[in-house]
């Protein structure tokens, strides 16, 4: 089960986001089980997210996706929601919080991240500090075929 939080987007931020040049941020959090999210977890992670967004003058928070990672290699609803949002141009940057991989397989993570990149979205992983798409790709221990894809992408 995936949860999407809008933080008052429709009520308060729609005009602000529509009338600004700021980059729209979609944050992705994984938790052990979405049925077991505690208010303290939401508060702590939300504060951490808001601190990161505040460091960048040209960023504005659009939405947050919570996803369960108890079945790490299964098709998670949050990932599908993010791809749909990317296809509909609802955000500019994805921040993956406390995760550098969406699967135990580096290739699956790379493929998913590459799809977002091809849709014109920037992807950053945040584990202690912010990591770029290049740093994510280098950390994934890609297969030779995926490494060639990545090298071709860098040259384009």
Language model feature labels by segment:
Residues 1-156:
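Short, structured surface patches at the beginning of a domain
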